[in-house]
Amino acid sequence: MHWPPEFGKVFMILEDGFSRRFHYLRLSVTEACNFRCTYCLPDGYRPDGRKSFLTVDEIRRVVYGFAELGVKKIRLTGGEPSMRRDLPAIIETVANTAGIEKVAMTTNGYRLKDRAQQWFDAGLRSLNVSIDSLDPRQFQLITGENKLVEILEGLEAAQKAGFRKIKVNTVLLKNLNDHELSQFLFWLKKQPIQLRLIELMQTGEMDARFQKHHQSGLPVKTRLLREGWTQQNRNLTDGPAEVFSHPDYQGQIGLIMPYSKDFCTNCNRLRVSSVGKLHLCLFGEEGVPLRDLLQADEQNSELQSRILEGLTHKRETHFLHDGDSGVTPHLASIGG
């Protein structure tokens, strides 16, 4: 138990059995997506008529509950969050929650050019934009959409809107974009962003594609160190990326390598799906249902108790090395 003076009461901290503390929540607001990325939803999003996604009030209650437990950063994910018409209201609700210091969002950038200012004004301060290729034809091959130019224009719009923390997510894909590293590095010379190169991860529906396209990030790390890039220290709410900088580049490189040794040692995030399930790991269990405790503000104590009890079941590590990707069918199902 801890007693921060600003609360004036006993304050429970999210800590698991391996002394890892959790200050970061990834909150999915929808499973729907308008892209057909080869590594996630190659056949497009197929709606399940039985599902309804968390309402703004339910989002307010779950964020408040986690904030009281010490969460400081919320990342809105999907699917594609901008598919929600009430996204500005969601952003504003999260940003106005006491204790939340940073609101971020991961997006495919489809609506970024037109909505960046609106999102910034609502309280969003950090963006991750998925760009898996700088070649328009290859981008369309990977995502199913010929939208690279518009998304790059969206990055410019985001910078003009006031965003100072912009990252670009690029999934490393053997035989699809693994030859583009030099092009990305050239782009970073004058782009004040962080390029996050992410190893393709195995999920239930992606076994064959994983075997065909998985590319280790270790050769990239070796090249960066050889070319004078230096690794940076991690902050409390940072993700799992190994971040590198270079004096000749305005941008940075972040490597996310879930198959590397000790990847889970510094885990600092939990996930809540768009239907209100707490997921302890991207590659874990069925999830702990929370939605029944998001129907009234008076349920907050019971909600927090269920979260804390669920956390006792968090495993020390994933088992991807053994081919065990858990029950996650695809990354859109729990927010990646």
Swiss-Prot record:
Task: Return one Gene Ontology term, BP aspect.
Answer: Mo-molybdopterin cofactor biosynthetic process
Q: Which residues form the Radical SAM core domain?
A: 17-238
Name its co-factor(s).
[4Fe-4S] cluster
Per its UniProt entry, what is the enzyme's top EC class, as one word?
A: lyase
Cite the entry's keywords alphabetically: 4Fe-4S, GTP-binding, Iron, Iron-sulfur, Lyase, Metal-binding, Molybdenum cofactor biosynthesis, Nucleotide-binding, S-adenosyl-L-methionine
EC no.?
Answer: 4.1.99.22
Report residues binding [4Fe-4S] cluster 1: 33, 37, 40
Q: Which residues participate in GTP binding? A: 26, 75, 106, 167, 269-271
Q: Which SMART domains match?
A: Elp3
Binding-site residues, S-adenosyl-L-methionine: 39, 79, 130, 201
How is the co-factor bound, per the entry? Answer: Binds 2 [4Fe-4S] clusters. Binds 1 [4Fe-4S] cluster coordinated with 3 cysteines and an exchangeable S-adenosyl-L-methionine and 1 [4Fe-4S] cluster coordinated with 3 cysteines and the GTP-derived substrate.
- Biochemical pathway: Cofactor biosynthesis; molybdopterin biosynthesis
**Reaction(s) catalysed by this chain's protein:** GTP + AH2 + S-adenosyl-L-methionine = (8S)-3',8-cyclo-7,8-dihydroguanosine 5'-triphosphate + 5'-deoxyadenosine + L-methionine + A + H(+)
* UniProt GO MF annotations: 4 iron, 4 sulfur cluster binding; cyclic pyranopterin monophosphate synthase activity; GTP 3',8'-cyclase activity; GTP binding; metal ion binding; S-adenosyl-L-methionine binding
Function (record text): Catalyzes the cyclization of GTP to (8S)-3',8-cyclo-7,8-dihydroguanosine 5'-triphosphate.
Q: Which NCBIfam families match?
A: moaA
Subunit structure, interactors included: Monomer and homodimer.
The Swiss-Prot or TrEMBL record describes its family as follows: Belongs to the radical SAM superfamily. MoaA family.
Name recorded for this polypeptide: GTP 3',8-cyclase
